Amino acid sequence: MFHGQGFSRNRCNVVAVVSGAELCDTNNQIDGTSHQPKYPFPDLSSSGRLKFQVLNNPTPEEFQVAVNSSATDFVYLQGEHSGDSDEVGPLVLGYTDFSTPDALVTLFGSTLPTTVYLELPNGEELAQALYSKGVQYVIYWKNVFSKYAACHFRHSLFSVIQSSCSDTWDVFHVAEASFRLYCTSDNAVLPSNSNRKMNYEMGPCLLGEPPKIDVVSPEADELEEENSLESLPSIKIYDEDVTVRFLLCGPPCTVDTFLLGSLMDGLNALLRIEMRGSKLHNRSSAPAPPLQAGTFTRGVVTMRCDVSTCSSAHISMLVSGNAQTCFSDQLLENHIKHEVVEKIQLVHSVVNSEETKRGFSEPRRSASIACGASVCEVSMQVPTWALQVLRQLAPDVSYRSLVVLGVASIQGLSVASFEKDDAERLLFFCGQQINDTSNHDALLSKIPNWLTPPLPTRKRSEPCRESKEIENGGPTSRKINVAALRPIPHTRRHKMIPFSGYSEIGRFDGDHTKGSLPMPPKHGASGGTPVTHRKAFSGSYQRKQIISLNPLPLKKHDCGRAHIQVCSEEEFLRDVMQFLLIRGHTRLVPPGGLAEFPDAVLNSKRLDLFNLYREVVSRGGFHVGNGINWKGQVFSKMRNHTLTNRMTGVGNTLKRHYETYLLEYEYAHDDVDGECCLICRSSTAGDWVNCGSCGEWAHFGCDRRPGLGAFKDYAKTDGLEYVCPNCSVSNYRKKSQKTSNGGLLVP
């Protein structure tokens, strides 16, 4: 984990010790009448970063062998679950009771894990004993608690660890905020008539120190009075707060400070996880904010920093600080982390507004939001960069931390990892769900404007009919496929929002740009090798638009496909189909498989994805945009092209197909040709032309030779053949060598 604390970066090894009976399965139901909801107990199974080793009633020797042999990061000790009681009992292994501090300490040998979670009643003294023995973090319960509250907290804890590389300190605070939201009787979202709720003081606790971020300069030892944090130059991050509307899984209720405080603490901890594991990829000089420029002292510089978070969300920040800080990559990265994690309250509740004074309105239910469960609306203020992070994490089906907090939608964007069992677990603590249709219709009058339902006369789709039939309790022949109902984004291009008060065009002429963004690893390789980028051209056109070769740090698709220039079309299409299925885009893959893929027609022929992809990546990738002549340079190489073609708008059609089928695939593979313009040596967007002699690419606008035609004359099908300046000189020299005797050609 960060600076040696927490879990390993790639995997978290967990040893789970279950005492008494085995883990409760999903068939367990509350004792009582049949109308009471069933609680789906999750299994302890390996997923994502989590690797579980479950031990049922092990001996102390078996436990120590498991801890020593697997480089254990996390030990989970579960108390007894008796069938006639909902309360969790002490830790009993075989016939030995380990409910005393001395007995529990003897269970651990010389090898200690980073974190121990004691799911045992009255565990404060036990936790103190383990903490004194040397365990960095100990999670425990002060009092007696129910197995339902314990399961909710445990599932929240492991879901956050599964999703991202995180520290125990932040993981605990996300899970503890979820516990306060759904398991305590003080919460206004949850009715207080349920005996399954607990008081907040009875919740889980943590022993341990928060991880520190080292911001000491490597050269500080050589300088006087620079051995402490206070003597080092600090930075300032310029960003604006925006109001964000969240949909939380739960019945509608009235806003109160307890609800807002719990959600605020959970989101703050979640964003701290993302920024604690962030990485600075690029920094460049930038103008100061217009309203702040007059307050800068001498020596203060402003930098535009491109940062990727722990879960590969890409953001851009405008920061200012001392030159020593801003021109050192590692020092600047650590200062940004320190400023965000330890100094700034990222999320703020919306106070003194109309929305906090009136009751919640219940938005219209949707199968793509919390799997059709009831939701309520909450507004919070977050920085602009934090909103970008949350919106990039929401469509990720493997990211479970938002589900832990019950967040089902962010500004209308649904959280893709929300499952039906998640909704049932959260609503279990909310008591009886609101199913009365009259009350539901009355609440529809207060729907937020951004979730206004369609007109009643609009024809409903088949999935909507199936969803409504299930809600009404009608018979259904097959289980609804929730994943197929989720909206499929046409692009996962993470937009980097610049500062609103200035334009990137106005960068300083004396920019000290340092591109430290490493090239992604070669396709199929296990690790990444940094590749030095060509130095960007410093002309005025370059300052207007600088585009990286890999604008989105997406997880690579680990497959064995050959390079795009040598692989076969069948191999390519199979790889694309597999990638789309992994990404959850099942609707793009027809039932017939490869014989029917892709299910798109262009110019009366099946869309030629293979040649479309090859031509685009050979010209710099989709982000080059209009620098590619889609009709003249791409469409003419596809099987869909005909000599008698009379199609209009084919360029926009190809772009839409590429965004739908191939854009994410391009970002997850290293097929983009990173060659630069042979004249200006840059890879920016522009009017690209290909030399017919050497095959190199150049910006047509960079070629200032007289006598050239217009760009459209070279870009159109069967147009003029472009010959670059280098080849023109070479051809002229060859002709000169072949001529003699007054210019007569020697045979």
From Swiss-Prot:
Residues 566-670 form the ARID domain. The keyword Zinc applies. Pfam families: ARID. One of its GO terms (cellular component) is nucleus. InterPro entries: ARID4 (IPR042293), ARID_dom (IPR001606), ARID_dom_sf (IPR036431), Znf_FYVE_PHD (IPR011011), Znf_PHD (IPR001965), Znf_RING/FYVE/PHD (IPR013083). Keywords: DNA-binding, Metal-binding, Nucleus, Transcription, Transcription regulation, Zinc, Zinc-finger. PROSITE patterns: ARID. It comes from the Eukaryota. A zinc finger (PHD-type) spans 674-730. Residues 454-475 are annotated as: Disordered. It is found in: Nucleus. Residues 459-471 have a biased composition (Basic and acidic residues). One of its GO terms (molecular function) is DNA binding. PANTHER family: AT-RICH INTERACTIVE DOMAIN-CONTAINING PROTEIN 4. This is AT-rich interactive domain-containing protein 4. The lineage of its organism: Eukaryota, Viridiplantae, Streptophyta, Embryophyta, Tracheophyta. The gene is ARID4.
